[in-house]
């Protein structure tokens, strides 16, 4: 027994429905199948009872008023009403004609289930058929007569079969067999409605459906695998084509990269020829460290020569973890040139002459403060030109003599006094080391030789002795005025036998002690006597001659004027 049947029985007991009402409720239930013919036949027989008729018709009208999800109540109630009109009492058809408006309203019955199916179409069609039957009296009469004959035949057949078999209950097949033509038609219509409902329901997945689903999945999987293999093959062919194109264009790319590397490499080394006439630097004479490789791939750059004569800097190593090379001895850029190592040639002066054929002797030519050596005059002139200080200066437009070298030679040529070893004449005159005569004819000799056509005799270059850079070389002839030892050391006692010639002392005599009189200060004032101080109302100004007040008229009350004292001796050596 289903749950709906149990619930219906419980309601029947609670509401205390009668036997006729219970049968109508069962025939018009919400079950998915239609009412049985035997049950409808029993209800039709009860319509001849007045009490049962009222109960049956009240329950049918109540079922027709349902709506919504109880659409089966409405449909089965109209099916039962049609059966009762044809096989039941005539009062059934009379009451249905009186309440035809209730049946006509069912033509607009609407209900759509949650699956989207319109279930109200069956109710609307059944309502139209029932209204048409009630309005047509002739058809109603014919249908009623035919249905009653069919019911009688079925009743007789059932009575005969029951008499032959015995008093046993009729089989289910005989109960299900329609007893009349109207009942058969009702059952057929109910079966069609139920079949339509079952056809509209979604089909359940059976074993065949599962097999078809698995087959469809396998086919789709095979198709996907095939497409994947085709795609992989296309990718492989594309990769091979790319690699082949890379190999073909490899040479072109390499040449382009080499051209690009040449653009960013270091420039070519400077030309060996100096455009300003300087000799070519001899790189072999300067020991340099091995050039390190450029970490970015550039060629090694040779270290540039120092134009001031300093040693070439050691190039930085490309290895950041390599220990630094020991630094060489520091070179003073203003000091003397260090002696060249064995096997090294002289370093050329970048500011010197471009004549590289004349050998240079003496100190290294890289020192810019040493005097340039004398060179031969191509016009036959004197190899040395006179200078104002008596030293030999090299001529030429491409070399500039050192402005301090003449003072060095002047310092070495100063005469010394023969009285003592440490005595020097402060204002001693400059002694020319070499002064050509006023009537030197060497230039004329060269000019005559050129006019005749013979080459002028080459002058022998005069070697320049090496000089030592001292503070006196910067001070020149005024170096004797500054005591350099007293500036950096504490002065000691003056020896008793030492004497110096001071031109500022009176008479130019030697000074045996510290000078008392300063020639650059005014003379000290004369000492006044007591009488002069007593007579002077204004104290004398230091450094001014004493003043005396003399009476205009020579009054008798004033004492006679004192004779002036002797004038102070003048000790200024510059005054005559």
From Swiss-Prot:
One short Pfam name that applies is: ENTH
Positions binding a 1,2-diacyl-sn-glycero-3-phospho-(1D-myo-inositol-4,5-bisphosphate) in this chain are: 8, 11, 25, 30, 63, 73
**Which InterPro entries does this chain map to?**
ENTH, ENTH_VHS, UIM_dom
A single GO CC term for this protein reads: clathrin-coated pit
Q: What's the gene?
A: EPN1
State the residue spans of region: 3 X 3 AA repeats of N-P-F: 502-574
Give start-end positions of Low complexity composition bias.
Answer: 157-167, 265-296, 332-368
Q: Which organism is it from?
A: Homo sapiens
One annotated GO molecular function:
phospholipid binding
> What name does the UniProt record give this protein?
Epsin-1
Residue numbers of Phosphothreonine PTMs:
460, 464, 470, 494
């Amino acid at each position: 027994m289903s749950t709906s049947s149990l619930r219906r029985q419980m309601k029947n007991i609670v509401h205390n429905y009668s036997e006729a009402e219970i049968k109508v409720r069962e025939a018009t239930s919400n079950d998915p199948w239609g009412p049985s013919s035997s049950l409808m036949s029993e209800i039709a027989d009860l319509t001849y009872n007045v009490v049962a008729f009222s109960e049956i018709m009240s329950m049918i009208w109540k079922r027709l008023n349902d709506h919504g999800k109880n659409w089966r109540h409405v449909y089965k109630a109209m099916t039962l009403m049609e059966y009762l009109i044809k096989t039941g009492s005539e009062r059934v058809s009379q009451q249905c004609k009186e309440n035809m408006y209730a049946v006509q309203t069912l033509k607009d019955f609407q209900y759509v289930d949650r699956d989207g199916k319109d279930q109200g179409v069956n109710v609307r069609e059944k309502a139209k058929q029932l209204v048409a039957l009630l309005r047509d009296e002739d058809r109603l009469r014919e249908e009623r007569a035919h249905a009653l004959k069919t019911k009688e035949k079925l009743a007789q057949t059932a009575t005969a079969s029951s008499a032959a078999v015995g008093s046993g209950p009729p089989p289910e097949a005989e109960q299900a067999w329609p007893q009349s033509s109207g009942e058969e038609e009702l059952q057929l219509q109910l079966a069609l409605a139920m079949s339509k409902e079952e056809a509209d329901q979604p089909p359940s997945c059976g074993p065949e459906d599962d097999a078809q689903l698995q087959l469809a999945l396998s086919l789709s999987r095979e198709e996907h695998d095939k497409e994947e293999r085709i795609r992989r093959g296309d990718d492989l062919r594309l990769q091979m084509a790319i690699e082949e194109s890379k190999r073909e264009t490899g040479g072109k790319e390499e040449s382009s990269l080499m051209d690009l590397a040449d653009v960013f490499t270091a420039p070519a080394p400077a030309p060996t020829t100096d455009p300003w006439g300087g000799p070519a630097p001899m790189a072999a004479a300067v020991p340099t460290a091995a050039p390190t490789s450029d970490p970015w791939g550039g060629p090694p750059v040779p270290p540039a020569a120092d134009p001031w004569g300093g040693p070439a800097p050691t190039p930085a190593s490309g290895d950041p973890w390599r220990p630094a090379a020991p630094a060489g001895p520091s070179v003073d850029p203003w000091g003397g040139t260090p002696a060249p190592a064995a096997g090294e040639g002289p370093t050329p002066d970048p500011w010197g002459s471009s004549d590289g054929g004349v050998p240079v002797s003496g100190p290294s030519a890289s020192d810019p403060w040493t005097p340039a050596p004398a060179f031969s005059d191509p016009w036959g002139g004197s190899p040395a030109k006179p200078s104002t200080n008596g030293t030999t200066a090299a001529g030429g437009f491409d070399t500039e003599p050192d402005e301090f070298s003449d003072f060095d030679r002047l310092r070495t040529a100063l005469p010394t006094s023969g009285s003592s070893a440490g005595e020097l004449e402060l204002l001693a005159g400059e002694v020319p080391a070499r002064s050509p005569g006023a009537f030197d004819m060497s230039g004329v000799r060269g000019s005559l030789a050129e006019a005749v056509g013979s080459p002028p005799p080459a002058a022998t270059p005069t070697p320049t002795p090496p000089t030592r850079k001292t503070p006196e070389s910067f001070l020149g002839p005024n170096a004797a005025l500054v005591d350099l030892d007293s500036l950096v050391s504490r002065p000691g006692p003056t020896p008793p036998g030492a004497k110096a010639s001071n031109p500022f002392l009176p008479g130019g005599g030697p000074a045996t002690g510290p000078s008392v009189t300063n020639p650059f200060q005014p003379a000290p004032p004369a000492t006044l006597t007591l009488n002069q101080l007593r007579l002077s109302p204004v104290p004398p100004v230091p450094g001014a001659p004493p003043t005396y007040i003399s009476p205009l008229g020579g009054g008798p009350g004033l004492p006679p004027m004192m004779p002036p004292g002797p004038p102070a001796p003048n000790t200024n050596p510059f005054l005559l």
